């Protein structure tokens, strides 16, 4: 299991009458999956758009989606729970035959590949229903480290924007999702909203021929993740966290994702991590003004790793 550290970088001297403390928190994981076994179950769900538009480009897109999904299935580690979802104006479980998850082994991979080979492209696009299908699959493994790949080539035209947002909100904290848009006709903002809220990535796959390698890499990365991490912020009475934003390697605002631990403490979920990762977070604390020469603790920053709280770092 990876070893985690959190370092705080800041200017500890404030101007007179200042009421804001800014700090950069660098969270680093080192050691990687080879350092120990993953705690608990892992889940991989592959969600592919099978709407009518996927039959375009003389069928290249749906063929590429089938091939990429089969490649991802082959990349899933033995013992990992998995499922495949087909998305149109509603979600359909492609594999397994009954709603639920199955463990990856030689037999289930062959069965899943066969089921995926029969997928056809027809229907509309309702991404929110696809996300909710993933959430339902995870009801049988609520504590698992869950990851989904979501692929679409078009816009969310078969449900309202309000329904999509409600589905995204429902899925926050339940699983991590990497979203990919195939071609150039998909809506960037829609997939960015999904990926940002679900602590994943969003990117374009311009050519169907590139999709198989993309799915393999996404799945391989997910298989290396082993820990759920949260940035735990404690502030003394009278001080408040104004924002928490990831600033490297990508830009993400985590402020609205805060989960209350108690009256003075909140957790900001950072998603699942593998070894040898480093991410930077800009935190801003609003404090009462003080007198020149006063020393004050603005916050304690801790990491919560799979439910285990680590020793704190101080924001002064």
Residue ranges and their predicted role:
Residues 310-316:
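Short beta-strand elements
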Residues 169-176, 187-302:
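Acidic, polar loop-rich interaction surfaces within structured domains
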Residues 10-12, 27-31, 50-52, 235-237, ...:
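Beta-strand elements of well-folded, non-transmembrane domains
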Residues 1-16, 24-26, 231-242:
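Low-complexity, acidic Ser/Thr/Pro/Gly-rich terminal tails and inter-domain linkers that flank the onset
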Residues 7, 17-230, 290:
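Exposed acidic/Ser/Thr-rich ligand/metal-binding surfaces
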């Amino acid at each position: 299991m990876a070893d985690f550290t959190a370092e705080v970088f800041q200017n500890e001297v404030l101007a007179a009458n200042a009421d804001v403390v800014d700090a950069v928190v660098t969270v680093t994981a080192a050691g990687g999956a080879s350092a120990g076994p993953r705690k608990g179950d892992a889940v991989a769900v592959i969600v592919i758009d099978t709407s009518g538009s996927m039959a375009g480009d003389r069928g290249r897109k749906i063929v590429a989606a089938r091939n990429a999904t089969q490649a991802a299935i082959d990349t899933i580690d033995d013992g990992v729970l998995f499922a495949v979802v087909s998305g149109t104006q509603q979600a359909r479980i492609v594999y397994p035959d009954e709603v639920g998850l199955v463990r990856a082994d030689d037999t289930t991979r062959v069965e899943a590949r066969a089921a995926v080979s029969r997928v056809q492209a027809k229907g509309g696009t309702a991404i929110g229903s696809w996300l909710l299908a993933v959430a339902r699959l995870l009801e049988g493994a609520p504590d698992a480290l869950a990851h989904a790949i979501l692929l679409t080539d078009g816009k969310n035209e078969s449900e309202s924007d309000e329904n999509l947002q409600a589905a995204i909100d429902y899925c926050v904290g339940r699983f991590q999702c990497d979203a990919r848009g195939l071609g150039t006709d998909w809506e960037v903002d829609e997939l960015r909203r999904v990926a940002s809220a679900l602590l994943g990535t969003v990117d374009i796959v311009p050519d169907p021929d590139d999709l198989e390698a993309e799915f393999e890499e996404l799945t391989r990365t997910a298989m290396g993740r082993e820990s759920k991490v949260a940035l735990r912020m404690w502030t003394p009475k009278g001080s408040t966290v104004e924002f928490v934003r990831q600033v490297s390697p990508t830009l993400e605002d985590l402020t609205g994702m805060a989960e209350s631990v108690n009256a003075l403490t909140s957790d900001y979920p950072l998603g699942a991590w593998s070894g040898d990762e480093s991410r930077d977070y800009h935190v801003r604390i609003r404090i009462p003004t003080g007198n020149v020469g006063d020393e004050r603790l603005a916050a304690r920053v801790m990491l919560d790793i799979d439910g285990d709280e680590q020793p704190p770092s101080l924001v002064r």
